[in-house]
Amino acid sequence: MTVQMEYEKDVKVAALDGKKIAVIGYGSQGHAHAQNLRDSGRDVIIGVRPGKSFDKAKEDGFDTYTVTEATKLADVIMILAPDEIQQELYEAEIAPNLEAGNAVGFAHGFNIHFEFIKVPADVDVFMCAPKGPGHLVRRTYEEGFGVPALYAVYQDATGNAKNIAMDWCKGVGAARVGLLETTYKEETEEDLFGEQAVLCGGLTALIEAGFEVLTEAGYAPELAYFEVLHEMKLIVDLIYEGGFKKMRQSISNTAEYGDYVSGPRVITEQVKENMKAVLADIQNGKFANDFVNDYKAGRPKLTAYREQAANLEIEKVGAELRKAMPFVGKNDDDAFKIYN
């Protein structure tokens, strides 16, 4: 199925005009949505629990309230807290204060699609999911363009949910560069699969395996790091700019030939079957339930995974090498300023 890219000219209704907007959470996505919408002339308040996020939102000039207070004041409520805390936050502080005709939005379909959150039938449910981290959503908006976004409607109680979703996307700058309509199911399952099988899980496992093969064969860890990790950015940037074609036009004939003959030896049909199993665990809710249950138990699995990852040899080698490369990691510092 193909989808049509839409732009500012396609946003026909200023559905947020006259609406009080509450952004719930002031982290990576929260600060970007709130600031961009405010700069687009929208009436935005922040709902967040006391702490660093609360203080940061006030410092940035927002009227800042508890989540309960913000929900009571708002017509449109965008929930941008971390996925794992949204259910308890919604049930305790948002749901009791919703009114018929309100709209509730998300930047990821996780809690709605897997039914951890169930919104009353007389409330709209929409999505605006920028395809980039919050600091990039904010920076590109300030530069006069934006980050593309997906939008979706899960529940249209008022007949205006799609207009709200599209106008929200316009307000954060996404419609400047392109919007794609999707569904909660499609966005959620594809996003999780991309993260797990390719972008995060698949990529880090591939890099680590390559590093281990080289070092176990007696090659210097520092050189192995450069070959399998440091140069990754150069290749990904080429693919990002012009697809596989530009990357292959930019590398040597030797590298291109090796790409064709050895890539399929690494990513075999068995690997593809493993990817299908990952997708199945996403589709049937196993991953979602495991993740949420781990959070409710105090994150024992996630904590153990983090400790194990921090002790990888490639991480230790990389940390030392990057000390000699001050130009690495100096951009986009705001990516790490997550206000909890």
Swiss-Prot record:
This is Ketol-acid reductoisomerase (NADP(+)). One of its GO terms (biological process) is isoleucine biosynthetic process. Binds 2 magnesium ions per subunit. It is an enzyme of class 1 (oxidoreductase). NADP(+) binds at residues 26-29, 49, 53, 83-86, 134. Mg(2+) 1 binds at residues 191, 195. Residues 183-328 form the KARI C-terminal knotted domain. Involved in the biosynthesis of branched-chain amino acids (BCAA). Catalyzes an alkyl-migration followed by a ketol-acid reduction of (S)-2-acetolactate (S2AL) to yield (R)-2,3-dihydroxy-isovalerate. In the isomerase reaction, S2AL is rearranged via a Mg-dependent methyl migration to produce 3-hydroxy-3-methyl-2-ketobutyrate (HMKB). In the reductase reaction, this 2-ketoacid undergoes a metal-dependent reduction by NADPH to yield (R)-2,3-dihydroxy-isovalerate. The gene is ilvC. Pfam families: KARI_C (PF01450), KARI_N (PF07991). Pathway: Amino-acid biosynthesis; L-isoleucine biosynthesis; L-isoleucine from 2-oxobutanoate: step 2/4; Amino-acid biosynthesis; L-valine biosynthesis; L-valine from pyruvate: step 2/4. The lineage of its organism: Bacteria, Bacillati, Bacillota, Bacilli, Lactobacillales.
